[in-house]
Amino acid sequence: MHCPFCSATDTKVIDSRLVADGHQVRRRRECAECHERFTTFEGAELVMPRVVKQDGSRQPFDEEKLRGGMLRAVEKRPVSMDQIEQALTKIKSTLRGTGEREIKSEMIGNLMMEQLVNLDKVAYIRFASVYRAFEDVSEFGDAIAKLQK
């Protein structure tokens, strides 16, 4: 690995640790030339399935779109970034675990709602109201009633 400080090619690993529930390796490295230390993260590159939209079009899975949807739902709610990242990791693991090359966007929305209902009920209602396109107050009431069961 090249040193980010002096671009030398000779670096050595000083320390390695598992992070992110064992899904990544954190390595502390030192440059043999300038002796600067830096941290790298290594993870498996796993291919996500393509997303089939409701109109039948297909597009690559977009993790940032997933993250953005969750961040909008939990905005100004007492949910930590760690909780959000864990929920996103669970969603991605479930999608990869299907073994399918393509998945429907509906499945992603349902997985998102499963995670949000466990994180924050208000965030769940926010997301569900947009995802399910609530038309009036009674639909909000129905969703809240389901949460209270």
UniProtKB/Swiss-Prot annotation:
UniProt protein name: Transcriptional repressor NrdR
Single biological process term from Gene Ontology: negative regulation of DNA-templated transcription
Zinc finger boundaries on the chain: unnamed: 3-34
Family label: Belongs to the NrdR family.
Keyword annotations of the record: ATP-binding, DNA-binding, Metal-binding, Nucleotide-binding, Repressor, Transcription, Transcription regulation, Zinc, Zinc-finger
A GO molecular-function descriptor: ATP binding
Organism listed in the record: Shewanella woodyi (strain ATCC 51908 / MS32)
Cofactor-binding details, from the entry: Binds 1 zinc ion.
Domain annotation ATP-cone: ranges: 49-139
Function of the molecule: Negatively regulates transcription of bacterial ribonucleotide reductase nrd genes and operons by binding to NrdR-boxes.
A Pfam family the protein falls into: ATP-cone
Cofactor: Zn(2+)
HAMAP family: NrdR (MF_00440)
Lineage, top ranks: Bacteria, Pseudomonadati, Pseudomonadota, Gammaproteobacteria, Alteromonadales
